[in-house]
């Protein structure tokens, strides 16, 4: 039996990060955590491109364009959708998650879901660097692992 898994080595990987500007008090912290995770695992800052979009709903389109370019080993999507008093939360959350998954499957490039979908601002703050760690950092590690796993599969 052969076993395959990705490593967390970021050397020579080219990564894109798509960040929503909406709820920037959260997404800025997710981006900081993500960049910290990448730098701690030897990703050269010259190999990281950051793209800003207005809101989470716009993330899948930009991720698709980047994935189609075949320039990146992985793409990290960062955003924060926080429930309000209207059904808007459900629409945006559902479409963003479906859109990101579809891009990854269609383009065969890992697109990591680092979009927080929280009921409250406090939950989002907790996941952006306080009690629950930083989900941006976690997304960075997922991107490294998946990028390396995809390389291993291609080489086997």
Swiss-Prot record:
GO molecular function, one term: 6,7-dimethyl-8-ribityllumazine synthase activity
Protein name, UniProt field: 6,7-dimethyl-8-ribityllumazine synthase
Keyword Cell division tagged: no
Origin species: Caldicellulosiruptor saccharolyticus (strain ATCC 43494 / DSM 8903 / Tp8T 6331)
PANTHER family xrefs: 6,7-DIMETHYL-8-RIBITYLLUMAZINE SYNTHASE, 6,7-DIMETHYL-8-RIBITYLLUMAZINE SYNTHASE DMRL SYNTHASE LUMAZINE SYNTHASE
Binding residue positions for (2S)-2-hydroxy-3-oxobutyl phosphate: 85-86, 127
Top EC class, one word: transferase
The keyword DNA-binding is annotated on this UniProt entry: no
Function in brief: Catalyzes the formation of 6,7-dimethyl-8-ribityllumazine by condensation of 5-amino-6-(D-ribitylamino)uracil with 3,4-dihydroxy-2-butanone 4-phosphate. This is the penultimate step in the biosynthesis of riboflavin.
Pfam families: DMRL_synthase
Superkingdom per UniProt: Bacteria
């Amino acid at each position: 039996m052969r076993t395959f898994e990705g490593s967390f080595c970021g050397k020579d990987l080219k990564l894109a990060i798509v960040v929503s500007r909406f709820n920037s008090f959260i997404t800025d912290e997710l981006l900081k955590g993500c960049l910290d995770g990448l730098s701690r695992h030897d990703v050269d800052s010259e190999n990281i491109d950051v793209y800003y979009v207005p809101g989470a709903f716009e993330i899948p389109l930009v991720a698709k364009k980047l994935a189609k370019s075949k320039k990146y080993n992985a793409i990290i999507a960062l955003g924060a959708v926080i429930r309000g008093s209207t059904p808007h939360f459900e629409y945006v959350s559902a479409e963003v998650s479906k859109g990101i998954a579809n891009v990854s499957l269609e383009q065969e490039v890992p697109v990591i879901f680092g979009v927080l979908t929280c009921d409250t601002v406090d939950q989002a703050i907790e996941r952006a660097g306080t009690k629950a760690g930083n989900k941006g950092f976690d997304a960075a590690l997922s991107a490294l692992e998946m990028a390396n796993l995809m390389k291993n599969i291609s080489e086997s």
